[in-house]
Amino acid sequence: VIDEVHAADEYMETYLEAVLTWLGMYGIPVVLLSATLPPARRSALLEAYRRGRGSSGAGAEPVDGMIGYPAISTVSSAGVCVHEIQGEAEVPKRIIPTSLGSPREIAELLDHELAEGGCAVVIRNTVREAQETYEAVRSVFGREQATLLHSRFLAAERVARDRCMLELFGKDSVQRPFRHVVVATQVIEQSLDVDFDLMLTDPAPMDLVLQRIGRLHRHDRGDRPVRLREARCLVLVE
């Protein structure tokens, strides 16, 4: 089982396709998971496994093109089959360009947006920017209402912080704070099932922006502050 398969870079993709072909040859089941896999990558991964299964060549169905979301694509010796699935009702979300020039301005905006409570996440593209933004947020909100998360923490500290994220902002959290800001880097995009009322993010490729937005109003909650009941993602632009 390989999760977040879209995150593979070009180097990893070459090895992944080779591994899929080998696994297909031995008939080993493989599950690939992604919420933002482009059609071309889906096609390449399906074709790699299909080559191993020995089902490519004349008469094989094409695997290119757009399909609905969510969907399950399966490969067997008989070929490729796509099953579109009825998903849950989509939560309307707005992406709003926002011009903020400094970490201090970000902290002041959050102080205003969370005046009636709520949990927000700020996603910066570098560790340095995350650290600077966290210091500004902490100076406004205090240490108890601010958390920093990035990849440079030691492994034990990173595990502890990930666990804290799930305890405070996970689906089944019973400790969700009244008001809190998490400042993070891209590490929060994947694998953490957390839910925030408001999001601020640096610009990023669209597939990564969609991954980030997946942490915004992720779960049904009837207790969100009134001003945060509309899911908003503020993109920090110069």
What kind of feature is each model-predicted range?
Residues 6-83:
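Post-DEXD/H (motif II) to motif III coupling segment of the RecA-like Helicase ATP-binding lobe
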Residues 110-204:
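Conserved helicase/translocase motor-coupling segment
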Residues 7-10, 38, 129, 190, ...:
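Residues immediately C-terminal
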Residues 3-5, 203:
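Walker B catalytic acidic pair
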